[in-house]
UniProtKB/Swiss-Prot annotation:
Membrane topology type: Peripheral membrane protein
Keyword tRNA processing annotated: no
HAMAP family: ATP_synth_epsil_bac
Entries under CDD domains matching the protein: F1-ATPase_delta
Encoding gene per record: atpC
Keywords in alphabetical order: ATP synthesis, Cell inner membrane, Cell membrane, CF(1), Hydrogen ion transport, Ion transport, Membrane, Transport
Protein name from the UniProt record: ATP synthase epsilon chain
Compartments in which it is found: Cell inner membrane
Lineage: Bacteria, Pseudomonadati, Pseudomonadota, Gammaproteobacteria, Pseudomonadales
Native source organism of the sequence: Pseudomonas syringae pv. tomato (strain ATCC BAA-871 / DC3000)
Amino acid sequence: MTVHCDIVSAEGEIFSGLVEMVIAHGNLGDIGIAPGHAPLITDLKPGPIRLIKQGGEAEVFYISGGFLEVQPNMVKVLADTVQRAADLDEASAQAAVKAAEKALNEKGADFDYGSATARLAEAAAQLRTVQQIRKKFGG
């Protein structure tokens, strides 16, 4: 059994097709959506979205946060930004984590703690996504 899934960002539609399962990172941990799931709307934290497409092939995306809507015949992910996990660069993600950590440690008079922690959380989620993909698929 499959359900139609759309992943949409501010830049446009990133994915549209039939999937057997959607696994996303919500506020209370990972959530798996299969055909027949009860209707639901929840917010998503930065991290990977894994799609098990029709036929069992997996495709992974990174989202910087957003919302997940589940209806009887449709799953929709509305995200701020979306990248295919294969397009993420581990070295860049590590550098972003280090830069965010440095900014947190070197607070100045005009320091914005909320912005700095948000940058750190997003960079760490990107790095986690890259590492999960590399571990799972040996890339």
